[in-house]
From Swiss-Prot:
Organism domain of life: Archaea
Gene3D superfamilies, alphabetized: L-arginine/glycine Amidinotransferase, Chain A
Described function: Binds to the 50S ribosomal subunit and prevents its association with the 30S ribosomal subunit to form the 70S initiation complex.
Protein family according to the UniProt entry: Belongs to the eIF-6 family.
UniProt keyword annotation of Protein biosynthesis present: yes
Protein name per Swiss-Prot or TrEMBL: Translation initiation factor 6
Signal sequence coordinates: none
Length: 233
């Protein structure tokens, strides 16, 4: 994917909530969103993240709007929890060519325990071997287990694209280097939504842009721009 060009960061609220990350999953080739978000929100998501509107797929997962919590993926594949037969068919029909994997694990909150870009995946320690194999096979990347800043729900504490990454503000220099080595992109530490440490809860990004919660401050946005845009300002 492109490592050059502009990188847009724009504020968004969904259902009056700045925690937009719990509702959305994004890669360079698609976005998953709740089935009842408005047309204006779909248009904003499409424009900022550079994804065609027909590839902003609206659905519920296990009957819930929390798409960003329950799913994750990269440009090659999407990971869904068990018990989602209808959703699997919907995604496969909408996103031809994208792999869909059902992860056999005790945790339905895949977005909290798995974080990935198109080069690698970091999973919370303790995920079952069969689950890790499904993740690797579906996404086409190596899976590494680890935690960041004492946080085992790594998917809530990290946002990474193919250009850069933003991690929990308590991540050490050694941890930031570890993340950079795993994902093959530079990493920064930061916050969203006026000091929230779990950056994924209010931040959704790909190589082309980022959407942040409405409470995110100017300095936080500047940090996100540099971290996820690969230094583009």
């Amino acid at each position: 994917m492109s490592n050059g060009g502009s990188f847009t960061v724009e504020k968004l609220s969904l259902y009056g909530n700045p925690n937009i990350g719990v509702y959305l999953t994004a890669s360079d080739s698609y976005v998953l969103a709740p089935d009842d978000i408005g047309a204006d929100d779909v248009r904003t998501i499409s424009e900022v993240l550079g994804v065609a509107m027909e590839r902003v797929v609206r659905l519920r997962v296990l009957g819930m709007r929390l798409v960003g919590v329950l799913t994750t993926g990269n440009s090659r594949g999407i990971l869904l929890p068990e018990g989602v037969d209808r959703e699997v068919e919907l995604v496969r029909k909408a996103l031809e060519g994208v792999e869909v994997g059902i992860v056999p694990t005790r945790s339905n909150a895949l977005g909290n325990v798995i974080v990935c870009n198109d080069r690698a995946c970091l999973a919370s320690p303790g995920l079952e071997k069969e689950a890790l194999k499904t993740v690797s096979d579906t996404l086409g990347v190596e899976v590494v287990e680890g935690s960041v800043a004492g946080v085992y729900t790594v998917g809530s504490a990290i946002v990474v694209t193919n250009r850069g990454g933003l991690a929990h503000p308590d991540a050490s220099e050694e941890e930031l280097k570890f993340l950079s080595d795993v994902f093959k992109v530079p990493f920064e530490a930061g916050t969203i939504n006026f000091g929230v440490e779990f950056v994924r809860t209010g931040l959704v990004a790909n190589s082309y842009g980022a959407l942040v919660g409405e409470d995110t401050t100017g300095p936080e946005i500047a940090r996100i721009q540099v971290a996820l845009g690969g230094g583009v300002k």
